[in-house]
A protein has these predicted regions:
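Conserved sequence/active-site signature of Rossmann-fold short-chain dehydrogenase/reductase
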Residues: 5, 29, 73, 124-126, ...
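Active-site beta-alpha turn of Rossmann-fold NAD(P)-dependent dehydrogenases/reductases
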Residues: 26, 66-70, 91, 120-122, ...
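NAD(P)-dependent short-chain dehydrogenase/reductase
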Residues: 80, 103-162, 166-175, 202-206
C-alpha cells in the first residue's frame, strides 16, 4: 500500500513495476471533507494524477493510464440526460479537483501522446463499499436500513439519481480498458432514473427501517447536483 501523496514512494513503485495498465482509483471522495481540508484534497485528487502522468512520461513507459472520475464534476446539470459532451461546472472542491485530473489526462494525451482513458461513475452501490454517512448516500441508507436504524431522506424523496451496481461498474471498467479509444471519456451508469422516494419504499419492504422525510440542510442545497441521469450509449457502443 502506498499513500498517493507520498510522491517519492509512488514514483519508485511505478519505476520498479513498469505497469502496462495503471488504473487510478485512489482518492478522497467526500465532498464535505474537501471543504474541511482543501489543500489535502488537491494533493490527493489532482496532484497525484499529475505526478503519475509525468512519471509515465519521464520513464517513457508504454502504459495505459486509466482515471476513475465522478459525476460530481458536472455540478448542477444544464440538461438531462448528461453525456460526454455535457458542460462541467462543479459545485465542490472535490469536484473541481477531479475535473482538473481529467484535464491533466487530456493534456498528456494531446501533447505527449500518452494512452489515457477516463471514466465517470454515477451513484454506485454494492458489497464491501465503505459505509460513511457523508460519502456514499445510497450504500449508507441501505446499510442503516438493514441494521434497523432510522434513516432520513431529503425533500420527500422527490429527486432521482442514476444508480449502478458495483458488478456493472467493474464490467464497464474492463470494457473501457479493452476497447476504449485512447484520449476518450466514458460514462459508466445504468442510464435509468431511480427516485429516492422509490428507494425508500423498497427499503421499507425488505427491512424494518423507519424513514423520516426531512428538508435538506442549507449546505446540501448549495452543492447538491439535484436530479441526475446519464446517456451511457457511448460505453454501450463498445459492446458493454
Amino acid at each position: 500500500k502506498i499513500d498517493v501523496t507520498n510522491f517519492s514512494k509512488l514514483g519508485k513503485s511505478i519505476e520498479k513495476n513498469k505497469p502496462d495498465v495503471l488504473i487510478h482509483l485512489a482518492g478522497q471522495t467526500s465532498h464535505s471533507k474537501s471543504f474541511d481540508n482543501p489543500i489535502h484534497d488537491i494533493d490527493v485528487n489532482a496532484k497525484s494524477t499529475l505526478f503519475m502522468l509525468q512519471k509515465i512520461k519521464e520513464l517513457n513507459l508504454k502504459c495505459k493510464f486509466v482515471l476513475g472520475s465522478t459525476f460530481i464534476v458536472i455540478g448542477k446539470p444544464e440538461k438531462l440526460p448528461v453525456n460526454e459532451q455535457s458542460f462541467c461546472n462543479p459545485t465542490t472542491i472535490y469536484g473541481a479537483n477531479r475535473l482538473l485530473s481529467e484535464h491533466y489526462c487530456k493534456i498528456f494525451n494531446q501533447v505527449y501522446g500518452l494512452d489515457t482513458l477516463i471514466f465517470r461513475i454515477t451513484n454506485s452501490f454494492g458489497p464491501r463499499e465503505q459505509v460513511i454517512k457523508n460519502k456514499n448516500a445510497v450504500n449508507y441508507l441501505i446499510h442503516q436500513a438493514f441494521k434497523g436504524n432510522k434513516i432520513n431522506i431529503y425533500n420527500n424523496g422527490n429527486f432521482y439519481r442514476d444508480l449502478i451496481y458495483i458488478s456493472d461498474v467493474i464490467t464497464g471498467i474492463k470494457t473501457i480498458i479493452k476497447k476504449g479509444k485512447k484520449g476518450n471519456l466514458y460514462w459508466i451508469s445504468s442510464g435509468k432514473k431511480t427516485w429516492f422516494h422509490q428507494l425508500g419504499s423498497w427499503l421499507t419492504q425488505f427491512s424494518d427501517v423507519k424513514i423520516r422525510y426531512v428538508n435538506s440542510p442549507i449546505y446540501t442545497q448549495k452543492v447538491d447536483v439535484g436530479n441526475f441521469v446519464v446517456d451511457n450509449s457511448k460505453l454501450k457502443s463498445l459492446g458493454w
